[in-house]
């Protein structure tokens, strides 16, 4: 028998049916109705096992609504009646995740998974690793924050660091408990999971949309995302969204379960929906067996998945492996082969990117691939077109690589028409007519016009400049930038800060309010960081991580501007190609003029001078654990990095020192086991003072 998760009574009492109070006691009657409706909600939306007919549920629901209307003092925040939606929002506020929502690395072939298992085994110095395996849902990643057991906030993944607050809409998802089913909830619990729409629910939604003359959704993921991002939560409430929990962010006031499988079992006890399609296996053989079994079952599943996920099961081992870049070393997504379809190439055009890259693009007869209608597909570069021998008129195999980016895989020889036309790379840019050039050691051809002559490069460069990870100018999208460039209102990024209110308000699809918002966003963007500014400049080969390293190494813009190629090569992870690209960009008078104009416009950031003195911790790796008496972890890390040291997230044989504070956990034990030098805060500060 299914335990009663809604009662705070003992397990022995959990299965008892509470006595039904009559209407003479409204408070008791309302409490009983809430319990009954929550119980039936859980059976229907989480267990997928309806316990009463819909008509009986509706009868109880209407009775509770009537009671709460006549006795407003009985209304509580987590009443089932409060899931119907609230008044529309004007926008979704931003939420900074306490623990970043990281992405996973991908594997596509068996060899990728075997290699992953070997990396894990080597990293743990162990064989036959125990893994937790689960499905990779094709929905929208969400973080649910519970405080003292109550749902207080829900946010989308966003860029991993910052998402959108969709709490009002999430409250309408009946599968998600508004209160955890426990008498002893954690102080803070961040539940990570996926919001999705079942295939059958999508079919019903599209039927309603057709009848109402509304927009139909191509696939369940689009429907889930579109429904969750409705500013009017009453619309969200009308759409059947589901949720599965699969991960954790912040946890305070409770002990972390020892394994991922134990975490999911705990979630189920708390009343959170957890997918039953999961297992604990050992080694690469167990992973591949799970993948094969799920692949065979995939067509019969009620929801869309695009792969499976493998995670090292033991939390202690996860912590030992740590992270690389923006992904954990202890987990990987094993993607299913991308869906493919046949269509014809109606033409091949070239697109010009922000760095002048010329990319051939196949214009295709519309075809449905993986639930999405595809009309264009990348051909990457001229050499790739030649290698695959793609011609206009060909019947081709189109694949959504990684189920996202459409690409042409190959042509079908027996279907090639006699009048098929080979692709001819133009000699001049289709946008500005500048010569197209191609260096001997590069596969990509480029427009030589630069952003001064080429409108396509200007548009691409400006869109990059205002993007979220660069200057983060909200409201400046493709259509607006296109108008500004095409109407010759702006030429460079510096011109953005010279824009007047009237010039913006008179553009198509703009009004006074929108123009005011863009003006405010531009003003706000002037206060930035050196790393963001460097990244926003769009220097070829300089991504986010490289921009951060440059800012950290040089400390201020002037030092970077004066740096030689040799000095640039001293920066972590910068090689000759990147150093030459940076030096070439900074040697161009037009680029230097742009930087000066941006600073004159008021773009600013905090700078610090990097002192040219020995780095005593160079080559040393530190791990921080526990709570230090006076320094936060960030402050301790800054001091270590300023002295040339590296701060890692996990302990290994390569660790030089472990800095331990109060409540140090498994990292301290691991350090003692490996014989690594352990420092407290005072010893760390003394070590730093010794070298000053």
From Swiss-Prot:
SUPFAM superfamilies: BRCT domain, DNA ligase/mRNA capping enzyme, catalytic domain, Nucleic acid-binding proteins, RuvA domain 2-like. This is DNA ligase. Belongs to the NAD-dependent DNA ligase family. LigA subfamily. PANTHER family: CHROMOSOME TRANSMISSION FIDELITY FACTOR 18, DNA LIGASE. Disulfide bonds: none annotated. The gene is ligA. Residues 1-27 are annotated as: Disordered. Zn(2+) binds at residues 429, 432, 447, 454. GO terms for cellular component: cytosol. It comes from Janthinobacterium sp. (strain Marseille) (Minibacterium massiliensis).
């Amino acid at each position: 028998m299914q335990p009663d998760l809604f009662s705070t009574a003992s397990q022995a009492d959990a299965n008892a049916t509470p006595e039904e109070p009559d209407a003479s006691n409204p408070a008791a009657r309302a409490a009983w109705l809430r319990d009954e409706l929550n119980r039936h909600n859980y059976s229907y939306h989480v267990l997928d096992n309806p316990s009463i007919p819909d008509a009986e549920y509706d009868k109880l629901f209407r009775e509770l609504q009537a009671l709460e209307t006549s006795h407003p003092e009985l209304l509580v925040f987590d009443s089932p009646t409060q899931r119907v939606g609230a008044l529309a929002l004007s926008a979704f506020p931003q939420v900074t995740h306490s623990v970043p929502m990281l992405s996973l690395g991908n594997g596509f072939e068996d060899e990728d998974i075997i290699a992953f298992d070997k990396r894990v085994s080597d990293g743990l110095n162990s064989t036959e690793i125990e893994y937790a395996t689960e499905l990779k849902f094709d929905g929208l990643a969400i973080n649910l924050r519970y405080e003292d057991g109550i749902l207080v906030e829900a946010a989308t993944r966003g860029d991993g660091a910052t998402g959108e607050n969709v709490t009002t809409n999430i409250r309408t998802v009946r599968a998600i408990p508004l209160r955890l089913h426990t008498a002893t909830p954690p102080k803070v619990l961040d539940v990570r999971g996926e919001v999705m729409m079942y295939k059958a629910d999508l079919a019903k939604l599209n039927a309603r949309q057709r009848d109402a003359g509304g927009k139909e959704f191509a696939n369940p993921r689009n429907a889930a995302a579109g429904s969750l991002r409705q500013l009017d939560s009453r619309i969200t409430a009308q759409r059947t969204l589901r949720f599965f929990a699969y991960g954790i962010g912040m946890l305070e006031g409770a002990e972390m379960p020892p394994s991922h499988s134990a975490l999911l079992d705990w979630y189920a006890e708390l009343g959170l929906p957890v997918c039953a399609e999961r297992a604990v296996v050992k080694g690469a053989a167990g992973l591949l067996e799970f993948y094969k079994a799920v692949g065979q079952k995939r067509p019969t599943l009620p929801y869309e998945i695009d792969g499976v996920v493998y995670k090292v099961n033991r939390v202690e081992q996860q912590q030992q492996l740590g992270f690389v870049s923006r992904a954990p070393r202890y987990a990987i997504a094993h993607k299913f082969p991308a869906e493919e379809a046949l269509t014809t190439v109606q033409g091949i055009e070239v697109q010009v990117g922000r760095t002048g890259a010329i990319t051939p693009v196949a214009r295709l007869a519309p075809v449905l691939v993986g639930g999405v209608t595809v009309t264009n597909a990348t051909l990457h570069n001229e050499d790739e077109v030649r290698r695959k021998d793609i011609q206009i008129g060909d019947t081709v195999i189109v694949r959504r690589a990684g189920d996202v980016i459409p690409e042409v895989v190959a042509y079908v020889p027996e279907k090639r028409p006699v009048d098929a036309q080979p692709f001819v790379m133009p000699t001049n840019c289709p946008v500005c007519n500048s010569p197209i050039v191609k260096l001997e050691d590069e596969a990509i051809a480029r427009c030589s016009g630069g952003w001064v002559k080429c409108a396509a490069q200007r548009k691409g460069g400006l869109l990059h400049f205002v993007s979220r990870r660069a200057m983060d100018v909200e409201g400046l999208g493709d259509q607006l930038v296109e108008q500004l460039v095409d109407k010759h209102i702006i030429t460079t990024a510096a011109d953005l800060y010279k824009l007047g209110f009237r010039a913006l308000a008179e553009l198509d699809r703009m009004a006074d309010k929108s123009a005011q918002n863009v003006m405010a966003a531009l003003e706000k963007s002037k206060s930035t960081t050196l790393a963001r500014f460097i990244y926003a400049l769009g220097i070829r080969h300089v991504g986010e991580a490289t921009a951060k390293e440059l800012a950290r190494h040089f400390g201020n813009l002037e030092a970077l501007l004066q740096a030689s190629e040799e000095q640039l090569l001293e920066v972590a992870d910068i090689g000759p190609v990147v150093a030459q690209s940076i030096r070439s960009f900074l040697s161009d008078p037009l680029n230097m003029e742009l930087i000066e104009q941006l600073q004159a416009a008021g773009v600013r950031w905090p700078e610090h001078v990097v002192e040219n003195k020995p780095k005593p911790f160079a080559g040393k790796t530190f791990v921080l654990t526990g709570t230090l008496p006076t320094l936060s972890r960030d402050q301790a890390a800054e001091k270590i990095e300023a002295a040339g040291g590296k701060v890692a997230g996990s302990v290994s044989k390569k660790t030089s020192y472990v800095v331990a504070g109060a409540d140090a956990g498994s990292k301290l034990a691991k350090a003692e086991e490996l014989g690594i030098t352990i420092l407290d805060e005072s010893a760390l500060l003394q070590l730093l003072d010794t070298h000053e």
